[in-house]
Amino acid sequence: SVDLKRSMIFVVIAMLPAILFGIFNIGYQEDPTRSILDNFISGLIVVGPIIVISYSVGGLCEVIFAIIRKHEVNEGFLVTGMLIPLVMPPTIPLWMVAVATAFGVIIGKEIFGGTGFNIFNPALVARAFVFFAYPAQISGDLVWKVSKIDGLSTATPLLTASSKQGTEALDLLNGVYSWSDMFFGFIPGSIGETSTLACIIGGVFLL
């Protein structure tokens, strides 16, 4: 319907600040001394294929189930295809993105009847699948980030703080990341999770 299509488009637009900053931040984490454009291009090289795989596999699953159920493909996959890359780390293998996307769309949505009938968010189902099936890629004490140095990784702010308690945790956190870095998103993490500001902008747009 027109209302569903409009709603899905609005949600995709709301995600653009997070995805665009996430692309830039991946390049920034690799080399903060480069220009904004160079960092964005570097991040796009990493994130672009993840988005393409997510949309391709998710769209294929949607088409197959639409054929089986003999109805049109709805616009729900536009949101799912963007959400899945947002919750994934930038170094996740592309084949893993494909498997997680298929699992998330089929188990998280299609078995319940498709968009509007699912009780779980397909993107979070995909993330949970990767978390339990391939924990080394998405969990542990370190979150991987793209780097010129193979194997370079860094602790996330939450893990840094959780290693201590009370004011000691805050002091340790301040020593690693500034509050402005954490608010604007100049920290390592999953593609769309780092920038509080970008998430707020998207949320305000939806209001």
Sequence positions of predicted segments:
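Structural signature of hydrophobic alpha-helical transmembrane segments
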Residues: 40-56, 91-100, 187-196
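Long hydrophobic alpha-helical segments that form multi-pass transmembrane helix bundles
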Residues: 116-200
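C-terminal ends of transmembrane helices
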Residues: 58-70, 106-116, 201-207
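N-terminal signal-anchor module of multipass membrane proteins
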Residues: 1-55, 59
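Membrane-interface helix-loop-helix junctions at boundaries between adjacent transmembrane segments
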Residues: 72-151
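Short, amphipathic, aromatic/basic-enriched membrane-interface segments that mark the entry/exit
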Residues: 2-4, 45-46, 63-73, 89-92, ...
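Hydrophobic alpha-helical bundle architecture
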Residues: 86-89, 190, 202-207
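Alpha-helical transmembrane segments in multi-pass membrane proteins
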Residues: 10-18, 49-62, 77-81, 85, ...
